[in-house]
Regions:
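Conserved strand-to-helix beginnings and helix N-cap segments that scaffold or border functional pockets
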Residues: 4, 27-31, 129
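Glycine-/small-residue-rich active-site loops that bind phosphorylated ligands and cofactors
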Residues: 24-25, 123, 160-163
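Glycine-rich phosphate-binding loop and adjoining beta1-alpha1-beta2 segment
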Residues: 25-47
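Conserved beta-strand termini and adjacent loop/short-helix elements that scaffold enzyme active sites
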Residues: 48-50, 119
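Glycine-rich SAM-binding Motif I of class I
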Residues: 1
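Basic, glycine-rich polyanion-binding accessory segments appended to enzymes
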Residues: 159-179
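Cofactor-binding loop segments of dinucleotide-utilizing enzymes, especially the Rossmann-like FAD-
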Residues: 20-22, 50
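Active-site adenylate/phosphate-handling loop in enzymes that bind or generate adenylated species
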Residues: 5-15, 19, 40-41, 55-135, ...
């Protein structure tokens, strides 16, 4: 989110944001992303509905590391495909932070030859939150709990199914808001 706002400040209407809805997000998170970044900020944001694609790719997989690998691979593939469809694209801005560099495999410095710019790569999450606050982003977005790339899939200790995701999404929502 902070990188989208920074990118918008830097290049304005030339920024094309791609939001990949994996179906592995918390309850209402997809709608919140679209409402804030597209509707409120007016960013050129396109939502890619890849929920079925991710469910299919994760079918029968229970190992957390394998889930993370599959999700990362699918995200990069979809991003590559969607970026190729944008005229005159010159670079990709990605929200990699220090924790990502320590715990996730490096995905490379280019996507299909396009350089990847990582403006918050050397910052920890609390520092990124400070940047978001300085940019005037709402607390509900800036203070969100960090969430792994594999999303809810990493919290399911079995293979990922739509039913398990729905149950976990509801349980997570109750825990975050009512407990």
């Amino acid at each position: 989110g902070v990188c989208a706002v920074l990118g918008n400040l830097a290049i304005g209407h030339k920024l094309h944001c791609i939001f990949i809805d994996t179906g592995l997000l918390r309850k209402n998170e997809s709608e919140q992303v679209m409402a804030y970044y597209h509707d409120n900020l007016g960013l050129n944001l396109r939502r890619i509905d890849a929920r079925e694609e991710f469910l299919t790719a994760l079918a029968g997989v229970s190992d957390p590391a394998e889930k993370e690998r599959i999700v990362t691979e699918r995200l990069m593939s979809i991003l590559s495909r969607e970026a190729a469809a944008i005229d005159d694209i010159r670079l990709v801005i990605q929200g990699t932070n220090v924790t990502d560099t320590l715990y996730r495999p490096h995905t490379g410095s280019t996507i299909d030859g396009l350089p990847i710019i990582e403006p918050v790569r050397e910052l920890f999450k609390d520092e990124i939150r400070q940047v978001g606050q300085e940019l005037g982003m709402p607390a509900v977005l800036v203070n969100r709990q960090p969430f792994p790339g594999s999303g809810l899939a990493s919290r399911i200790m079995a293979d990922v199914t739509a039913e398990r995701l729905d149950i976990l999404r509801e349980a997570d929502d109750i825990f975050r808001h009512d407990v």
